[in-house]
Amino acid sequence: YMVIQGEPGAVIRLGDYLIDQGL
């Protein structure tokens, strides 16, 4: 999992990551 700062959709991918972690 990588976040490219300033890339459109980064927040959405972050949300998906947190869901995968069960947070």
From Swiss-Prot:
Miscellaneous notes: On the 2D-gel the determined pI of this protein is: 4.5, its MW is: 14 kDa.
Subunit structure: Occurs in many kinds of cells as a complex with monomeric actin in a 1:1 ratio.
Principal location class: cytoplasm
The protein, known as: Profilin
Highest taxon listed in the record's lineage: Eukaryota
Location in the cell: Cytoplasm, Cytoskeleton
GO molecular function, one term: actin binding
Disulfide cysteine pairs (residue numbers): none
Organism per entry: Beta vulgaris (Sugar beet)
Family the entry assigns: Belongs to the profilin family.
Keywords: Actin-binding, Allergen, Cytoplasm, Cytoskeleton
Assigned GO CC terms: cytoplasm; cytoskeleton
